[in-house]
Amino acid sequence: MNKLLAILLCVSMVLSGCTAVNDEIQDQVFDNFGCTDTNALNFDENATIDDESCIYDGPIEILEIADIEGCDNTNSIHCMLPFPSDAFLINDQNTTTGKRIHYSSTTIPNSGTVDLVEIPILNQMDGASPNTQIMTAFEKEPDISELAGQFSISKSLENGHSTQLINRITGELIPHWVELDIRSEEDQPTILHIRTIKALEHNTPYVVTISGLTDESGELVPTPEGFAALRDQILTSSMDIENRRAEFQNLFSFIEVNTDISIQQLQTAWSFHTSSTESIIGPIISMRNDALERIGEGGLGCNVETNEEIFDEQGNRSHWLISGTYTAPQYTESFYPPTLIRRVSVTDRTPVFVEDREIPFWLVIPGTAIEEPADLTIWGHGFLGTGDTSGLYGWANENNAAMLGTSFYGWASDDVTSLEYAVLDMNYFQHQAERLEQSMINQVVMIKSFMGICSDLPDLYLNGTSLVDVTEPVYTGYSNGALRGPSIIGLSPDLNRGVLWAGGSSFSHIIERCTQYDRFHFIFASEWGYENQLDRAVAISIMQSLWDSVESDTFLHLREEGYLDEVEPYELMTLFSIGDLQISNISSARMMRTANIPILDSSTIIPYGIEVVDENHSGSVGVFFDGGYILAPDGNEYGEEPHPAHNAIGALSSARDMAFKYLQFEDIVDTCNGDCSFSPDNLSWN
């Protein structure tokens, strides 16, 4: 009886595996794999290529492998490794990709505070984030000293490189670099990161292969047992593995055809499919469009609460500081955190209007505006700050720019407590992400309102003459404001140009190298959070899907061609500081590559894969300035503050001059005179 049950079990496993084939990819290039022997118990009349899975009446050996519900059982080190993976995708004909994420109630790691972490909205995404981390782990730590690193990226394209990232549609090798997680605990396996150098294509299948990895003694790193069973055609007790056997046969066939790697050389391999643009930004585009329809061309209203005329030490007028509120349609249930966006249903992410609310703004009008109206310049503030522009009076007067700001709720000063709780209960990262989405709509509405109804406020006039030119607003943002810039410019129909200072892209790639992470890491890594770095790394990577709707990578990816009639192309100048400990230069270079922004020839570094141009170039451009500061650590850890590099370029007059010539005249002017090195002495923001 036991023998018969074993046979029936194996038959059900293999047959169920035939239904789990990636239909889209198979239809494109692959035959049907299965048992072609009519004498076998599991003969498959639809199979065209035998996959050596035939089962016969006789003794059957089954490898015992733990089958953990909701996990990728090909790697027993962690439920969600490798990541991202098709293990967490199911077919769904109602999505753009034909796929949908499926995390069960046991998939996402629990914390020391919360036993069950479920974020149902993730299961509405139609693929993996194109901006997230790619990673796996082995029982023995590999020696990666000869692999592509952050300063030797081109190695990843060489024959025989141990890691490959392949576009499954085109067969193209994707440049990347390899890094071991420096934060791993000594008694735990070390995560191996495959670092992409820019955002991946949307709605695209990718393949990862790893082969030839050795440890420090030169011995091959052991293959995870679950993957080895698939590679070596060994039947297992894991329903998950058996259900995915045909999928892996398709994967192995692709690898054999498109690489020089033999299947037996593989130490692991997996595939994943990125989400579509529609899935990533469709809901926020819907929210933006609804808000614009509600406010009309001129906006709903503005109220001034304070208007201060500020004088300098000599008694001369310096500037006006105006604060107040503007009226904006709201889609979150509450103004205060934690809060979620109201949506059509649990299966439809379309936002639903809740009410109009008054949103604070700050406006600095320079004293120079009495001679000529100041250009309306939208300001993006730093991490966990506010939209208060009062400290920008020097920038304003220097460039005759009216600096208008509002807060990035979600990453604003009043979000600190909710973020501290979110690292203990990841459910609340959805609240944080959706509050940030609402803040992007607030930005769009503020710009439209100040071009319309708010421009008629008496406080914006002196002796009947307007102090602010609202006809062609531009954007500039620093740090977090630079990260938010691409989404604001992309979402606003009134912006087409911006300057981003000390920015980068892909929050999940930025955060562990950022000194701002320090204030949350202690709680995150505590016994109440996630004591295991494997869990922390996975958690950060999962959350990227929540942040993607306003992620800089997402809208940088759309910069040149836009998206349908919803996002227009736009131009950027990106300015960075060598040695930045808050936004790593790695992430800054990623920002440029994702947006396909060339670099000015006076830049102090030329990152891999970026075109070099001179000041006669028109369009987008980037520059790295170097004040000779101590460089950031190489690994995924942050350096030691205080460290001046991050804020230095905002205090550098040549950088400000370059930025505002670009904003106001669309000119690229090499204010560095061929070399953007600078002395850290006598820098001033005002």
Regions found by a protein language model. Give the residues of each.
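Acidic, low-complexity Ser/Thr/Gly/Pro-rich repeat segments typical of extracellular/periplasmic
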Residues: P59-P329, F335-Y336
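Secretory targeting signatures
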Residues: M1-D27
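C-terminal subdomain of alpha/beta-hydrolase-fold enzymes, centered on the catalytic histidine
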Residues: R435-Q438, N496-R497, W501-N686
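Cap/lid segment of the alpha/beta-hydrolase catalytic domain
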Residues: S334-E358, I370-L462
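N-terminal cap/lid segment of alpha/beta-hydrolase-fold proteins
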Residues: N303-P373
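Primarily recognizes the serine-hydrolase "nucleophile elbow" in alpha/beta-hydrolase
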Residues: S455-E512
